[in-house]
Amino acid sequence: MSIMIPAWVDGTLIPVEKLEAHQRGLRHKAVSVFIIRNGEVLLQQRAMGKYHTPGLWANTCCTHPDWGEDPAACAARRLDEELGLTGIPLEHRHHLEYRAEVGSGLIEHEVVDVYVGYAPENVECAANPQEVMATKWSDASDLRAALSKYPDHFTPWLRIYMTEHADKIFGRDLEFSYSV
């Protein structure tokens, strides 16, 4: 089944097959979510079956909206599909653009709407094994240390978010303002 995502071709936003967008390095829309609980952020380790960046740690969830899908609705949908998380209100925090090679000749050139949500202390994830192989909660200090010591364990976009956009994503919620 072909997944059509919003991408710009010759300056016009049109539906493009997701893999084609990555193969051609087309600028396309994306959504990223960070869920926070008690001063920690929920990270996911991408499933080994993912066609790029398998096994790497990423933010809580990230995806591409379907053609015509509202970004906020997309963020809530993917939280449920990837992690079984529902009912967590999401706040739009930032809009950013980045370009990164993600292996196997694929390129993410994303225009991203970033959302933050706050989970109750008793929240439980039900990770979809086709999407996520592990989850963990990390405080700012631990994530800082891991990003510095093992940058290749993390997706390019998480490294970009945390080194270039943390202030705008987290504000005063977490102490993620730093340089690696």
PLM feature segments, named:
Residues 25-26, 52-58, 136-139:
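A short, polar/proline- and glycine-enriched secondary-structure boundary/capping micro-motif
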Residues 1-32:
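Acidic, metal-coordinating catalytic segment for phosphate/diphosphate chemistry
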Residues 33, 61, 92, 113-115:
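A structural signal for short, well-ordered beta-strand segments
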Residues 19, 96-99, 106-180:
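Nudix hydrolase/Nudix homology domain
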